[in-house]
Amino acid sequence: MTIGVVGRKCGMTRIFTEEGVSIPVTVIEIEPNRVTQFKTEETDGYRAVQVTVGERRASRVTAAQAGHFAKANVAAGRTVMEFRLEDGDYQAGDLINAEIFAAGQLVDVTGQSKGKGFQGTIKRWNFRGQDNTHGNSVSHRVPGSIGQCQTPGRVFKGKKMSGHMGAERVTVQSLEVVRVDAERNLLLVKGAVPGATGGNLVVRPAAKARG
């Protein structure tokens, strides 16, 4: 896995090319990612870099976390993320920002999707509705049969039914980086990314583009 960064979703807008073509983009703020720990095969059994981003009040930091951040000589952040590494070398206190990406590069963006609460099968799984007329009554949005009879005598695991929708980890792959604004720590990515405005995002070089 290649090094990535943790950012914050700012929202969507559009930019225009020199030919006048409108491109919808998501603006991602890449605050400086502070390295809190560099893991090696000798000490941890694998190579990885651990980063934190943002700020957190001292009253919200546990004693163990405070000691970990103090050892790395970095300020406490709102979240901690780890990236596996195949090569490269980092030291605690190093900064990683949007400059590791370039315009035209493909990236994978991971975030938590918007929570929709408890939803029925039509919204959750795109089931079709039943007839509005022809004798149908009070069953316009019900899923219908969910199984068989005495054999097997149960509902199979994984059956698509009503339930909680959204609020889960989602990755959108191979999005194009349209622009990198290193001065303002902004990354403009073509298209939409998961989650609500203000949510944390993990941006990595695209897995499928790395071969």
Curated annotation (Swiss-Prot):
The keyword Ribosomal protein applies. The modification N5-methylglutamine is found at Q150. GO terms for molecular function: rRNA binding; structural constituent of ribosome. Signal peptide: none annotated. Gene3D superfamilies: 3.30.160.810, Translation factors (2.40.30.10). Keywords: Methylation, Ribonucleoprotein, Ribosomal protein, RNA-binding, rRNA-binding. It holds the Pfam family Ribosomal_L3. Methylated by PrmB. GO terms for cellular component: cytosolic large ribosomal subunit. GO terms for biological process: translation. Belongs to the universal ribosomal protein uL3 family. Part of the 50S ribosomal subunit. Forms a cluster with proteins L14 and L19. One of the primary rRNA binding proteins, it binds directly near the 3'-end of the 23S rRNA, where it nucleates assembly of the 50S subunit. This is Large ribosomal subunit protein uL3. It comes from Pseudomonas fluorescens (strain SBW25).
